[in-house]
From Swiss-Prot:
This protein's name: 4-hydroxy-3-methylbut-2-enyl diphosphate reductase
Positions bound to [4Fe-4S] cluster: 12, 94, 188
Cofactor: [4Fe-4S] cluster
Gene behind this protein: ispH
Active site: 124
Organism: Geobacter sulfurreducens (strain ATCC 51573 / DSM 12127 / PCA)
Amino acid sequence: MEIVLAKRAGFCFGVKRATQMAFEAAEKEGETFTLGPIIHSPQVVQRLEGMGVKVLSDLEGIGNGTVIIRSHGVTSAELEDAVRRQLEVVDATCPFVKKAQEHVKRLSHDGYTVVVVGDADHPEVQGIVSYAEGPVHVVGSGEEAARLPNMKKVGVVAQTTQSFETLKNVVKECLLKGGEIRVFNTICDATAVRQDEAKALAREVDCMIVIGGFNSANTKRLAEVCSELQPRTYHIETAQELDASWFQGVERVGVTAGASTPKWLIDEVIERIQEFDNKKKG
């Protein structure tokens, strides 16, 4: 059985940067915290917890130490709270997310009603929205955008892991809603490239394995686009979840992974698939 690993499987630039910053901070003296999980990988979070890094939902009761801002970013109020408490702040916010936050702040300041294309419940979107000084709407599709009120000036940004197709559909609707529109494509290139690569791979294999946290938006989207082309697509977090029956009659298996999936997890999955194959041959 041939195992084909996608070239861009695993950590993206922003996640790699954030995890490096987190592990470096963990090695220093004093208490270290992250506001929410540093990335959407339970296994990486566990490793950091093993080094003494505590995951907090808020800073209530924290008077000293180092707080790491997760790769998805936090709200402006949470960042201000950390500064007010005189904590040492290690800002591991992905630069692409940071750019979206800055666009929202500037658009809002200039009198635009802001439309954020994304998932309203996602921490990245909640952080982006918090930088708006005026009206702001979150929409996840063109259909939702069609229900927006008419607006004089509209400014559009996107969650970094959104699909370009969704952004286009929302922009089309916003063109009908406002007299003036400004659009910033804040989708991370890595997201689109990974999805295109995964789709191409899914067409060429008999089975597709997508590795990443079940709480990871970009991993879930990878699994979705793969399953549209290859029904035998399986989304897993760890090698332990693999099932030998998935590979019956399979000659080529494709493997890809979300932007928050570490290399060691990918290696473990590939090793496990190889074990299944060796048993089959033996």
